[in-house]
Amino acid sequence: FLLSFDGGPSIVPGNTEALATFLRKQKQAALFFVLGQNLQTRRDKQSMQALRDLYRGQCVGTQGWQYRSHAQWKDWEDSVIRGVARAQSDLPEQYVPLFRPPYGQRRADSPAFFASQNLRVTLWDIDAQDLGPLTAEQSAQRTLTLMLLWRRGLIQLNDSQPKALEVVTWLLTNTAQSGIGWEDCRDFAGQ
């Protein structure tokens, strides 16, 4: 299984720091899908080195410049290009050429564009549903149940949600002696 986080980075200081620090302590390398505008906001408020240290040991893909459905949006390609450029420029060591479309929605004519940009569209298999009304423990139990059913997959959590850290902590604690394996994001990304 691989942990992935959407919609970051959070505001300074925020959930992103807590998640990334916890993952490093657990020797886990997760996949963070960032928004270009959020990365720009971070860049404006902290040093470039602090931003790079934030994602040290993790992988960073993109969700474009802003979190907006691509299904009906004319400027979606520009959003992707700008988001990739910001992530590559700011986080060259952590950047991986993976793109997660906001809401999982993309246009039928998008595959050629993504191929031309050398981006692999990366969805998820298991949604922790940490944005909804579930408690952190309910979200974690739901995730574990789906993990046991699917036996492998990409788990989606939301970077900006305080519940995400609680869910990850619960999952790692409750699977520690189970034999469940956690994939390194660099292996997944082919890096």
Residue locations for each model-derived region?
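Solvent-exposed, polar/charged alpha-helical surfaces in well-ordered, non-transmembrane soluble domains
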Residues: 17, 21, 78-81, 85, ...
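Soluble non-cytosolic domains of exported or imported proteins
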Residues: 10-17, 74-78, 104, 134, ...
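Divalent metal-coordination and catalytic microenvironments
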Residues: 6, 23, 60, 99-102, ...
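Catalytic grooves of carbohydrate-active enzymes
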Residues: 144-186
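Sec-exported extracytoplasmic/periplasmic mature domains
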Residues: 24-28, 85-92, 115-119, 144, ...
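Active-site-proximal loop/turn and secondary-structure-junction residues that shape catalytic pockets
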Residues: 9, 36-38, 66-68, 103-105, ...
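Active-site beta->alpha N-cap acidic-glycine motif
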Residues: 1-86, 90-96, 181, 188-190
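His/Asp/Glu-enriched short active-site or ligand-binding loop at hydrolase and phosphoryl-transfer sites
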Residues: 105-148, 180-191
